[in-house]
């Protein structure tokens, strides 16, 4: 428990100390923000700071810090360290700069920002990459909740159309269309703060339940400083990829511009962007602690948690909430596993619309122009979702690549932020260091993961267990990270010479 409390204190302190260093490095000022200057009543709408924070939290969180943290807890309390320091030095920095760079560039989408600082080739790569990723995220966060609602209806004794996935999927997609089309403060700005509060209450309830029940003990890092993963999966770099939103996530960079278009002052960025990421880190820390403390440990391995997750991630959330909070926890769990994915799905589609609008220079202040983009974006999402529900499309294999693409996106955004800081003659090491680190994480995972090159390089034991080829992956990951840093420094020298 001491480890947990120390990490919690470091996270909170990190917001006030390192978060302020990050904020001062960027240098917010009193210039007119896009929300005030453009204010189209649709995407550029001034919102109060507390609402900006809660909407940003729900946009970037959803179920990410819950699912990812529970999966990360399979490695044991060592995951506390990554959640804590990853949030402070990588995730918070990433979210802050993706939001503030957007704010300085008329609320532009992350693809446009990346192109400005890393060049037109990377801009086009990011445009395609972002739209595909966002539609995929939105679709998955429609199919998943639809299936969960069907399960709830069946368990409640209902029958007929209410117990069909297709019915609920259509309902969710209709809501997505409305939320993507109308003004951001009409639906998202009104209901998101409520669900953001629910997400926080659920996390507080979980940790309170653990603290007040003597049967549960949060293990200490120094007692289990190593992998407790039942399958023997290496900590590096699988844990760093798996935790994802609980420490750093490239998906956040697609969401931060939404709030960058709604800020009244640049000085709100520290609280809205860095603060929301720290809050998400705290939520992830709590759920990781739950995963480490509520389940049986056999032979120093988290076998109990592995069994719980094998029943399904939603089932694991339900189990944690019921054990720590009883009936109230069950109600909160249902809100969490159904509503939170939906609130990530609708903003994913909205971000896809805005990315396309920035790409093709289509103003979004008229209904007709929004329809031009909403129809194809939601149309593709509906095709994938309904196709999956009817069984003739299966993108499960494609979704496995999300973990890697998510952190690769974070890596690219951090390099873009580094170039921005260089051009502004500011301390670019504050972003270049985490960019280098994430370059190593992403490249190492690409070589080791079975869905990537691991299927070619790894081997199996006689019992079928995977032997990961770390002898190749680890050095290659380090070399790639160093190469990226060298390329960045070379680019800065070329730009310096050009401007001389």
Model feature map: region roles:
Residues 1-19, 72-102, 111, 330, ...:
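Extracellular loop-to-transmembrane helix junctions
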Residues 7-17, 130, 134-138, 196-214, ...:
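Selective recognition of specific alpha-helical transmembrane segments in multi-pass small-molecule
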Residues 10-66, 268:
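Membrane-interface "cap" regions at the ends of multi-pass membrane proteins
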Residues 10-11, 15, 56, 90-106, ...:
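Helix-loop-helix module between adjacent transmembrane segments
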Residues 47-64, 207-215, 224-287, 332-344:
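Hydrophobic, membrane-embedded alpha-helices of multi-pass small-molecule transporters
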Residues 99, 210-221, 275-319, 389-393:
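Extracellular/periplasmic helix-exit of transmembrane alpha-helices
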Residues 123-127, 162-170, 275-284, 292, ...:
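Loop-to-transmembrane helix boundary motifs in multi-pass membrane proteins
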Residues 138-156, 167-168, 180, 199-226, ...:
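Hydrophobic alpha-helical segments and their helix-loop junctions in multi-pass secondary transporters
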